[in-house]
Amino acid sequence: HTAYRRQRQMCIRDSYMTSLAILHECGYEIDNIIEKTKDVKAPKGRCETHKVNGGYAVIDYAHTPDAVEKVITAYNELKKGKVITIVGCGGDRDPIKRPIMGNIATTLSDYTILTSDNPRTEDPEKIMEDILKGVKTTNYEVELDRKTAIKKGIDMLQPEDILLILGKGHEDYQIIGHTKIHLDDAEEVENWKKCH
């Protein structure tokens, strides 16, 4: 658990150091900034780690090819077991990144569950077709229902495995059509724990 806590601290540190540099450039004294920010905590949904089913579920807002690659790569460096990734692509957004995301997730992860992530007004199956165009491996499955995808991912965990649940982070909704439906990745992990 220490290694995963360290990864979360690295995420926080990188953001903190960037903020520190910007504030200093704006004329604030470093010592004053450090004093005022010493109790700052990481935002919900950024490298947020939950111990579950003998492994770890990590919820992160990574939703671009670059961010997904960085998160999976970082956890591959820490892993003692497998890295299982749950990821999708948003609807009514840049379709060019979809096959790239599919390729990155399936190439860098030991196993991937491709799912929905705010399909909005697009057909989730069409979004998935776009994602699958980039997939060159067989270490994946498609589960369009995000809640079910999270349950499946947790069920797969073996001791020391890491389940990366990417894309929504702090969001507590799924947009289907023009309607926001309650869906919170962290809550789904906690619900699984309550039922098992």
Specify the residue positions occupied by each region the protein language model found.
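Single conserved hydrophobic/aromatic residue that forms the stacking wall/gate
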Residues: 1-14, 112
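ATP-dependent carboxylate-amine ligase
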Residues: 18-31, 35-45, 49-196
